[in-house]
Amino acid sequence: MAETQVRNFNINFGPQHPAAHGVLRLVLELDGEVVERVDPHIGLLHRGTEKLMEAKTYLQAVPYLDRLDYVAPMNQEHAYALAVERLLDIEVPKRGQLIRVLYSEIGRILNHLLNVTTQAMDVGALTPPLWGFEEREKLMVFYERACGARMHAAYFRPGGVHQDLPDQLIEDIGKWIDPFFTTLKNLDDLITPNRIFKQRNVDIGVVKLEDAWAWGFSGVMVRGSGAAWDLRKSQPYECYSEMEFDIPVGKNGDCYDRYLIRMEEMRQSARIMRQCVDLLLGKERVGPVSNTDHKIVPPKRGEMKRSMEALIHHFKLYTEGYHVPAGEVYAAVEAPKGEFGVYLVSDGSNKPYRFKLRAPGFAHLQAMDFLCRGHMLADVSAILGSLDIVFGEVDR
């Protein structure tokens, strides 16, 4: 009898695959239906962001950050603004901090809604995305009313935020919060007990805590494995230290735990939003939203029409930009996907000398081989969905 040669089978997953979430290409080595090896090929969305930012003034660099994790753009701007503010040694007024926190949490909900509902869609549930996107639409409108853009906001600037929020907008955000809890409960009732969803996610992609630290995981990926590590609590920035919220922590470190954590984080984000809205309509109702140093923050239009000095400040800001004292700084925020960090080196000029981005998705994607080995081919899309990867920040 002739001996048949059994060999492993190589297939491409993506870049055109609907579950590949963008331009991911995975080269999978399969033994039957079992995954033996995963080789992620990245760089299909590389735009040279870091280098481009080194040729721009500090203000012109802001829009590049929106185009990294474009699902929750303001959270990226936040890290950059914090880094520049630390080098300049300037304070953001309380009202400005509250607006930043409010919009960071809106970004977190935008991100988690997209992730949770598309994760459900990847394993075959078609209702959740329709419900989730209805809520995301309302939040996108809040983005638009704050800064004029639904996605690429350029709203958080070094020194504060671009413009104050009208009271009506803050009231509308307040009115959105309570009905959102009902929507979340509906989503919860639909997905959480679902037998098929559980079979596709429980005990899939398990990460032990020591492995999570070793791979450089952060955010939900670490909390799913049992560590209560959240930069908003452990290294508070802005006014997070004054906010009341809980950190949900998983115990199994599988895809299902990560899903549950994202669901609970949306509730906690809504709690933080409620506190911000109450303060913004209460004792912080009036006040500046950005630093009053006009060498860094442009003066108001009305002021420019009256004062020659204000006009000169405005002209200098938008042509030459401000000079940042020489030094280096690392600023990180708890972005929806994990720890988003900005390492900034200034040489005293009006442009950054070196600009390094620490994208959480990059660290998560590099563990794809470690996570998928020994799983079935169908589990790859479930694992990928639970990592929450957006290619803008991975390839940058």
Swiss-Prot record:
Keywords: Cell inner membrane, Cell membrane, Membrane, NAD, Quinone, Translocase, Transport, Ubiquinone. Its main location: membrane. It is an enzyme of class 7 (translocase). GO terms for cellular component: plasma membrane. It is a peripheral membrane protein. It is found in: Cell inner membrane. GO terms for molecular function: NAD binding; NADH:ubiquinone reductase (non-electrogenic) activity; quinone binding. It catalyses: a quinone + NADH + 5 H(+)(in) = a quinol + NAD(+) + 4 H(+)(out). Pfam families: Complex1_49kDa. PROSITE patterns: COMPLEX1_49K. Its EC number is 7.1.1.-. It comes from the Bacteria. NCBIfam families: NuoD, PRK06075.1. Belongs to the complex I 49 kDa subunit family. NDH-1 is composed of 14 different subunits. Subunits NuoB, C, D, E, F, and G constitute the peripheral sector of the complex. HAMAP family: NDH1_NuoD (MF_01358). NDH-1 shuttles electrons from NADH, via FMN and iron-sulfur (Fe-S) centers, to quinones in the respiratory chain. The immediate electron acceptor for the enzyme in this species is believed to be ubiquinone. Couples the redox reaction to proton translocation (for every two electrons transferred, four hydrogen ions are translocated across the cytoplasmic membrane), and thus conserves the redox energy in a proton gradient. This is NADH-quinone oxidoreductase subunit D. The lineage of its organism: Bacteria, Pseudomonadati, Pseudomonadota, Alphaproteobacteria, Hyphomicrobiales. The gene is nuoD.
